[in-house]
């Protein structure tokens, strides 16, 4: 199973808003604490019991870090490095709402236990800007 966390924008309150996809299908919105966010890259995932939340969570195997897992929250201050996942997002406020971490764990549970889940974390491509740059380069080099 493949997850992809696409980071869309940084917020005035110190967060990074994004979108989470599971096997190419939109799952929910994400929010990370910009100061403690996971580096971009490809990571394996596993099931981990969280004493803090008294439940199993979908955890991310980040080298040099422990207890990085998807959980609920609304603001960047609700995370010390973990991605928060939710149903809705308020881009102006830099917040999310409607915890989906339990739903995510249940969806991934069997694959997490079998070691068959990976996540790619990256910045989303800004297509309008990218196309403008490519267009300018083509114009410049074909004159």
Language-model features: where?
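Cell wall/extracellular polymer interaction/catalysis modules
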Residues: 1-117, 123
């Amino acid at each position: 199973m493949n997850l992809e966390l696409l980071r869309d924008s940084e917020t005035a309150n110190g967060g990074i808003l994004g979108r989470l996809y599971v096997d190419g299908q939109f799952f929910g919105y994400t929010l990370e604490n910009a100061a403690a966010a996971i580096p971009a890259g490809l990571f394996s995932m596993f099931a981990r019991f969280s004493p803090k939340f008294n439940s199993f969570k979908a955890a991310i195997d980040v080298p040099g870090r422990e207890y990085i897992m998807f959980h609920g929250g609304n603001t960047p201050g609700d995370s010390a490095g973990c991605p928060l996942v939710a149903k809705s997002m308020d881009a102006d406020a830099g917040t999310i709402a409607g915890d989906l971490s339990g739903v995510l764990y249940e969806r991934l549970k069997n694959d997490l236990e079998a070691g068959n889940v990976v996540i790619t974390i990256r910045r989303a491509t800004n297509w309008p800007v990218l196309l403008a740059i490519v267009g300018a380069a083509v114009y410049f080099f074909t004159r």
